[in-house]
Design a protein with these regions (language model features):
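N-terminal subdomain of lithium-sensitive/metallo-dependent phosphomonoesterases centered on the IMPase/IPPase/PAP
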Residues: 1-83
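Solvent-exposed alpha-helices and their adjacent loops that cap or buttress functional pockets
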Residues: 30, 70-72, 105, 141-144, ...
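DPxDG-like acidic metal-binding loop motif
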Residues: 72-131
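Short acidic/glycine-enriched loop/turn segments that link adjacent beta-strands
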Residues: 35, 118, 231-234
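An extended, acidic
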Residues: 138-248
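Acidic active-site catalytic centers that drive phospho-/nucleotidyl reactions
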Residues: 42, 65, 81-84, 88, ...
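Residue-level signal for inorganic ion chemistry
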Residues: 19, 42, 53, 86, ...
Length: 248
């Protein structure tokens, strides 16, 4: 399995280099929506990741935010968000990342999240302790919500924002602090390494959370993901250290 992880790390670093090089340059906007932006650099970055991964594993499939490649029923499927935190990136907020995961027969077995601005690389694979820049990490041990830092994602569409606002209101009054950071993958990475105690969001996509999912679980936390009935290919997620009582 290590060769899969090594390939994901190589692709994530290359993608991160591309994003860092373009961070302060003029950006081409492909689509602008009420609460989201799609950039040409998103497409370019996924193309780079696809080229690197499928050159090594030509029979694998890739499922990404910017499209799919290959037979999606393949036993091996890469799940990719080439730029998680696109709005942050567009507004020159240096909080975004590359997220790459590998599923085998539907189970996530490898996860890599790379923050190119802080040079932080989270890596994880099934059955092993995850690492941040080569050092092992675990989730926090905070059990009291009143002492916790909770991240709540607000999503992108009206119906999902309306679903997330009540969660944010609950947590704001009960947790020590709440954060709305704009990158689900980094939220998951922060839960995994103990910076956050939990992350909640309604209406998230698989590519946003796949890599973080295995990081949180191999770091000792728990991840509860449920398909939403009102929106295709969207999920509700609670990722936490596994001991905190969120009262939900």
């Amino acid at each position: 399995m290590t060769h899969y992880l090594d390939a994901a790390v190589e692709a994530a670093r290359a993608a991160g280099d591309l994003l860092r090089q373009n961070f302060k340059r003029p950006l081409r906007v492909n689509v602008a929506e009420a609460h989201d932006i799609k950039l040409e650099v998103d497409v370019q970055t996924q193309d780079l990741i696809t080229k690197l991964l499928l050159k090594k594993f030509p029979h694998h499939a890739l499922y990404g935010e910017e499209g799919t490649v290959g037979d999606q029923s393949s036993e091996h499927q890469w799940v990719v968000d080439p730029l998680d935190g696109t709005v942050n990136y567009y507004y020159r907020i240096p909080h975004f990342c590359v997220s790459i995961a590998l599923r085998f027969k539907g189970e996530i077995i490898v996860g890599v999240i790379y923050d190119p601005m802080r040079e932080e690389l989270w890596t994880g694979q099934k059955g092993e302790s995850p690492r941040l820049n080569g050092h092992n990490f675990r989730v926090s041990e905070r059990a009291d919500l009143a002492e916790a830092v909770i991240s709540v994602g607000l999503s992108k569409t009206g119906i999902m924002i309306e679903s997330n606002i009540p969660l944010l209101q609950q947590m704001v009054h009960r947790a020590r602090k709440c954060r709305v950071m704009g990158s689900a993958a980094l939220d998951m990475a922060y839960v995994a390494c103990g910076r956050f105690d939990a992350y909640l969001e309604q209406g998230i996509s698989l590519w946003d959370i796949a890599a973080g999912w295995i990081l949180v679980e191999t770091a000792g936390g728990t991840v509860d993901v449920r398909p939403r009935k009102d929106t295709k290919d969207k999920y509700s997620i609670i990722a936490s250290n596994g001991v905190i009582d969120l009262g939900l």
